[in-house]
Structures are given as structure tokens and as C-alpha cells.
């Protein structure tokens, strides 16, 4: 009997370990897609095709996984009054808004404004209701997750850094792995930089390197790099 249960347990772990999330492979970028984004200036020349391909592949896998996070918390499809924003809250959606990236991200700089950017634009703020209206639609499988940093005082420092550095500034939109500059940026870079540079002595993770250069950061992987965070709200 013990051997029987041991076999069942082993099979369970093997199944769990091989579980993967299905995604539409036609959404993976071709070299033509990559070259076009580079020519348009949306994607930095330092980003290799291989880095970009892996970034999008990982994002597609995360899209399915994070979309299931609603099981962990109360799901909401109402107005903004159902959630109280705190400075430093991280907003992540699978809505493909930022050209060149799967998903979109923003950071709350106070209790009313969410700072982000997108192709052809400079950083700007929008309300929570705007994000709900545009980035949460269950019928189209578009979801919006809100992640909260464990230490509220530090989260506010990140929010202030983002506001001071990017709100009302003319930073151009460009996706690459150069996190030392604020002259050009993209949605998830703003959030990552806010926590990396806004909090003294923080230990925020970096994306992988290739040939000495960092890969861009996927909006859908921000909660992996910025820790400790937890899912605070899920809008569908």
C-alpha cells in the first residue's frame, strides 16, 4: 500500500513539474517584426533578436499564469471606488498597449494617479478608472492585476522617484536594457527603475544578460523582480 501511494505521489509531482500554459505561437515575433521595431526606433539596437524572442515567449507564458491569479483574491469588475490606491502600487495588464511588448505596466505615484508611457508618447498619468475601463475585460480575456510592495514607506519612496523623474518629462519611448538612463524609457522600465533607484539599499533583481547587455523587462514579470510584493487586487 505504501508503495502504491509513493507511486501516486511521484506521478503527481511529475505532472505538476511538466505543467505549462498554452499560448498562441503565432504571436511570437519574427525577424521581420524585430527589424521593423528597430527601424522605427521602438526597440533599441542593443537588444538582439534572440533576447526579444525569449522576452516575448516568456511573456506569453506568464500571460496565462498571471491571468489565473484571480483565484487567489477577490475578483472585481466594478468602478475605482472598490479599491484604494497606495503610492507605489504596481499595475500590470496583458492588454498589448506598449508597442513591442506584451502587456503594459504603471506605478501609482499617489492615491489618484498611475504613471506610465507608451509608443509615440511621453510619460503621463491616468486614473484607476481609466485603467479599469481600458485594461480589464473578461469577455476578451484582458485582465488587470495590482501588486503591492510589502513595505509601504519604501513603496512611497519609489512612487516619489517615479513622479520626480518622469511626470511631465519628455523621455522618449524606447525598449532596451539600458536602465541607467532616463532620457528614453518604456512602461515596465519606469516601474523597475522607481524601485531600484528610489529605495536606498534595495535588492531589486535584474533581467538576464547576453553579450554583457541586459534584456528588456517584461511588464508581466515585474512582480518577479520587485520583491517582496503580493497581489492586492485583480480586475477582470
Language-model segments: what does each one mean?
Residues 128-152, 157, 214-229, 233-236:
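Intrinsically disordered, low-complexity, charged/polar segments
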Residues 155-175:
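Internal catalytic-core helix/loop-beta-alpha segment
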Residues 83-148, 172-182:
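Glycine-rich catalytic cores of cysteine/serine-nucleophile enzymes that process amide/ester linkages
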Amino acid at each position: 500500500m505504501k508503495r502504491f501511494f509513493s507511486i501516486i505521489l511521484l506521478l503527481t509531482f511529475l505532472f505538476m513539474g511538466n505543467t505549462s500554459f498554452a499560448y498562441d505561437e503565432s504571436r511570437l515575433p519574427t525577424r521581420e517584426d524585430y527589424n521593423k521595431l528597430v527601424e522605427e526606433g521602438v526597440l533599441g539596437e542593443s537588444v538582439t533578436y534572440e533576447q526579444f524572442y525569449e522576452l516575448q515567449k516568456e511573456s506569453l507564458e506568464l500571460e496565462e499564469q498571471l491571468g489565473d491569479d484571480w483565484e487567489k483574491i477577490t475578483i472585481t469588475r466594478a468602478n475605482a471606488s472598490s479599491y484604494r490606491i497606495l503610492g507605489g502600487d504596481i499595475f500590470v495588464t496583458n492588454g498589448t498597449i506598449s508597442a513591442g511588448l506584451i502587456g503594459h505596466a504603471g506605478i501609482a505615484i499617489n492615491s489618484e494617479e498611475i504613471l506610465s508611457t507608451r509608443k509615440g508618447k511621453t510619460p503621463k498619468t491616468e486614473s484607476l478608472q481609466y485603467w479599469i475601463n481600458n485594461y480589464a475585460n473578461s469577455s476578451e480575456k484582458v485582465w488587470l492585476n495590482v501588486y503591492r510592495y510589502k513595505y509601504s514607506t519604501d513603496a512611497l519612496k519609489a512612487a516619489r522617484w517615479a513622479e520626480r523623474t518622469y511626470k511631465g518629462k519628455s523621455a522618449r519611448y524606447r525598449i532596451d536594457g539600458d536602465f541607467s538612463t532616463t532620457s528614453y524609457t518604456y512602461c515596465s522600465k519606469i516601474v523597475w527603475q522607481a524601485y531600484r533607484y528610489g529605495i536606498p539599499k534595495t535588492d531589486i533583481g535584474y533581467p538576464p544578460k547576453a553579450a554583457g547587455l541586459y534584456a528588456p523587462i517584461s511588464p508581466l514579470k515585474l512582480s518577479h523582480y520587485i520583491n517582496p510584493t503580493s497581489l492586492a487586487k485583480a480586475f477582470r
